[in-house]
């Protein structure tokens, strides 16, 4: 019952937020995967109940191809690639459909070593990066994946793999927006952080939403910096996500 309730909670949340969930499908028997997040002075730790979850059973033939083909942006997290081989294949197929339809592909290199080993993760992520228009890695994940420490070196690395735009998330240090011709470090928005569980995903969504609104990558990065920072001022990955008005007001205040 817990897992069905979690699935119901997602659908209720999406309805409340006005999201189109018309193409969401429910597996008749498989549970909804659940992540547990614990906090300590050293940060947060994830534990998962995802084995044989509905998401892990995703396969290419289950994709809403027409829906993906009509999108302006298609976003994929490496976590979706990590949970199973069939989900990995579905991610590959979805990227191909999106690219053929003219969508821009964005990709977060989310590294979860409880889901796959580093060598497998690195190989798949490096295979995916050249297929992306917008790369949204974090500094910590990238240091593990590339063996590099410096943010500029990491940006060069991913640009060299073929991604034309890299927005490198650096937590309390802000972000680095990089293309083949420019590097811009955007300072962080200062807050008293409580829980950074959803900060990376908040940055991704905020950055992409502003690109869809017509912002250039620098303006989108400034907006996303603020949104991600505000999302750390409460507990959880969803509840603290700020509304657009709150982000714009924070930007006005500087």
Regions found by a protein language model. Give the residues of each.
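Conserved phosphate-binding/catalytic region of the ribokinase-like
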Residues: 96-100, 147-254
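Glycine-rich beta-alpha junction loops
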Residues: 41, 52, 111-113, 141, ...
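Short glycine/serine/threonine/alanine-rich loop segments
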Residues: 19, 103, 237
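Conserved N-terminal subdomain of the carbohydrate kinase-like
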Residues: 1-78, 249-254
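Conserved beta-alpha-beta core of the PfkB/ribokinase-like small-molecule kinase fold
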Residues: 73, 79-157, 173-175
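A non-catalytic, amphipathic alpha-helix used as a structural packing/dimerization or gating element
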Residues: 9, 93, 127, 131, ...
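Glycine-rich phosphate/pyrophosphate-binding beta-alpha loops
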Residues: 33, 54, 79-81, 228, ...
